[in-house]
Swiss-Prot record:
It comes from the Archaea. The gene is rpl2. Part of the 50S ribosomal subunit. Forms a bridge to the 30S subunit in the 70S ribosome. Residues 223-238 have a biased composition (Basic residues). This is Large ribosomal subunit protein uL2. GO terms for cellular component: cytosolic large ribosomal subunit. The keyword RNA-binding applies. One of the primary rRNA binding proteins. Required for association of the 30S and 50S subunits to form the 70S ribosome, for tRNA binding and peptide bond formation. It has been suggested to have peptidyltransferase activity; this is somewhat controversial. Makes several contacts with the 16S rRNA in the 70S ribosome. It holds the Pfam family Ribosomal_L2. It comes from Saccharolobus islandicus (strain L.S.2.15 / Lassen #1). Keywords: Ribonucleoprotein, Ribosomal protein, RNA-binding, rRNA-binding.
Length: 238
């Protein structure tokens, strides 16, 4: 008999399983403006769902935007935005102006996309070369990526790099960590459930108690375990 499984509930798309976008303070991206402008960091805040702190920057033309705060950035710091900005920590530059070896973050692929690469806490990319109208950058994954020389990037390293090393210490901290993401936590094992909740549930002890292999054509409520497995268990030694 089919069961209403966790993945079936998630596939329905109820708010329980969706990312709570209504908690975000705004879109973290560069504004689509041209020219060279001077701005000021008016605040550094936390954006629910992000590990990296977010800087609120106000430009001289009145435009406000959110961007990843970089290491060493402080409130009331002056930054420069756009083509012709010097290579200084916190400035938003056209990546084509950056010499080889420059450390950048929040890098666009093309002008106007708002930033695509090296955006998470503690990450950065390195300018490694130029080829025609493209700039080659080395991503945190060590992959070399070609981006437009008109694309914008922030000089420096995204702040908050030690967040993954900070111990959670208690389950409540982990609860709030996942509460603002599109992830369900905790995940309960099927063998720990009641028989009405999962095909592996029930019994006086935690065991699948039946073959865990299941057909590729099984209905969704029964399609758990080793799906269309050619074999299970350890390989026999020669």
């Amino acid at each position: 008999m089919g069961k209403n499984l966790l993945q079936q509930r998630a596939g329905k798309g109820s708010p329980t399983f969706r990312s709570p976008s209504w908690l975000r303070i705004g879109k973290v991206r560069y504004p689509n403006i041209f020219g060279h402008l001077v701005g000021k960091v008016i605040d550094i805040v936390h954006n629910p769902g992000m590990n990296a702190p977010v800087a609120i920057i106000k430009l001289e033309n009145g435009t406000k935007f959110l961007t990843q705060a970089i290491q060493g950035l402080v409130i009331n710091q002056k930054i420069e935005f756009g083509k012709g900005s010097p290579i200084a920590n916190g400035n938003v530059i056209e990546i084509g102006d950056a010499p080889e070896g420059t450390i950048v973050c929040n890098v666009e692929e093309n002008f106007g996309d708002g930033g695509k690469y090296a955006r998470s806490a503690g990450s950065y990319a390195v300018v490694v070369g130029k080829s025609g109208d493209k700039v080659l950058i080395k991503l945190p994954s060590d992959k070399i990526k070609a981006v437009s020389n008109k694309a914008r990037a922030t000089v420096g390293v995204v702040a908050g790099g030690g967040v993954v090393e900070k111990p959670l210490l208690k389950a409540g901290a982990n609860y709030w960590k996942y509460k603002v993401k599109a992830k369900k936590w905790p995940i309960v094992r099927g063998v720990a459930m009641n028989v009405v909740d999962h095909p592996h549930g029930g019994g006086l002890h935690q065991s699948v108690s039946r073959p865990s292999t299941v057909s590729r054509n099984a209905p969704p409520g029964r399609k758990v375990g080793h799906i269309a497995a050619r074999r299970t268990g350890r390989k026999e030694g020669k």
